[in-house]
Curated annotation (Swiss-Prot):
SUPFAM superfamilies referenced in this protein's UniProt entry, alphabetically: Amidase signature (AS) enzymes (SSF75304)
EC id: 6.3.5.7
Subunit structure: Heterotrimer of A, B and C subunits.
Mitochondrion in keyword set: no
Gene of this entry: gatA
GO molecular function per UniProt: ATP binding; glutaminyl-tRNA synthase (glutamine-hydrolyzing) activity
GO process terms (BP): translation
Identification of the protein by name: Glutamyl-tRNA(Gln) amidotransferase subunit A
GO cellular component terms given for this protein: glutamyl-tRNA(Gln) amidotransferase complex
Native source species: Thiobacillus denitrificans (strain ATCC 25259 / T1)
Record-linked PROSITE patterns: AMIDASES (PS00571)
Pfam families in alphabetical order: Amidase (PF01425)
Family, per entry: Belongs to the amidase family. GatA subfamily.
Substrates-to-products reaction catalysed: L-glutamyl-tRNA(Gln) + L-glutamine + ATP + H2O = L-glutaminyl-tRNA(Gln) + L-glutamate + ADP + phosphate + H(+)
Amino acid sequence: MPAPSLSALAAQLAAKQVSSRELAQQYLDRIAALNPTINAFITVDPEKTLAEAAAADALIAGGAAGPLTGVPIAHKDIFCTDGWLTTCGSKMLANFVAPYDAHVIERCKAAGMPSLGKTNMDEFAMGSSNETSFFGAVKNPWNAGYVPGGSSGGAAACVAARMAPAATGTDTGGSIRQPAALCGITGLKPTYGLVSRYGMIAFASSLDQAGPMAPSAEDCARLLNVITGFDPKDSTSLEREKEDYTRDLDLPLTGLRVGLPCEFFAEGLNNEVAAAVDAAVNELKKLGATTVEISLANSRLAIPVYYVLAPAEASSNLSRFDGVRYGYRAPEYADLNDMYAKTRAQGFGAEVKRRIMIGTYVLSHGYYDAYYLQAQKIRRLIAHDFAEAFKTCDVILGPTAPGTAFKLGEKSDDPVEMYLNDLYTIPANLAGLPGMSLPCGFDSQGLPIGLQLVGDYFSEAKMLNVAHQYQRVTDWHARQPEALA
């Protein structure tokens, strides 16, 4: 099944070549056929989807359609969705039906985009392989024996398998970009605060950010137009004039300065990934870009800093899951404290419990200054490194991940090895900068390779311009798994 762009689908809908109901049904049929293998979706409700599609058809017929009205979309199961199960990939919320819509869901509904369902994810967004989900591991569409990346693995896999034309994801330490790289699609993490976190179940509140996942940069730009905007219900939402992220897509790259951080091309980078990224750099040079050697010296500390700060915030955020107000409750307990203990012991998976324990430890008396405050200081140094780098370059380029997808179960027993998958993505989260991943080739096993761009604050349009121009002269983003064609 080809992957028409979002604008092409919208044009077909506007020209009455296909109805939104027909289009939604095509994707629902594909989900029904492939999801038993890929496991990309946790919840699918054809009745709800087709009702939303019928409403979109009415808007189109009445001349009230927006740019993406009638184009269906999948949502990561971290966004509260009124009337839908919202599980966050956890036993703790396995039966939780959200009573309201997250801001991202509101925006997509207002744009007339029917929901195809809720996608699988690592439990509470904690993972890099989508193996920690209570609902089972997601399989990589390019090879079902391999992981799709995480935590937005279901979103990435469903787009790569053409089960949805686009999806929403979230990125706390690389959870949009890393699975996008491993599944051969395009994914963008916006500047922190550009997309409201209201109704997005919190992992680490100072790092979490929602963003688009789609085959191409142009698609991501169109979806970013939908989901950005100020929201008074999120205290970190930024008041900025609404942008059109498609406006600069066709600008030439003449004079573009591309920063290449030496730390991102050091020991530990897979040779095939390095070669693919080098080839992408050469393509950008042909388009008029120049390269600049830069250093992000403190980025080598990003993983230890992240695994102090993110678990600390998770320890606080996840304290609300206590079995009292909503979610799972242990069936048997002696008293209130016993209920808390058994509910959390039974309701959370091993990785979530590991991170809660780490977070509680670093926030405890005697360790707060030694770990948490020191990590916050290094976080500022990482942001400063980026600020200095952007004095000499317009975008920063490197690999999205040190390698390609790995086999299911290969790193499950080695948390540190798993955490290293986010080596190149975490620095942008710590600094609050926008970052995106786009396909730039395949390894010798036929698994996708991802190229990462990091921009200065609010430079999403510039990054999308670079990515779009690269995708005009390459076809990596248009490839699809042959077995699923």
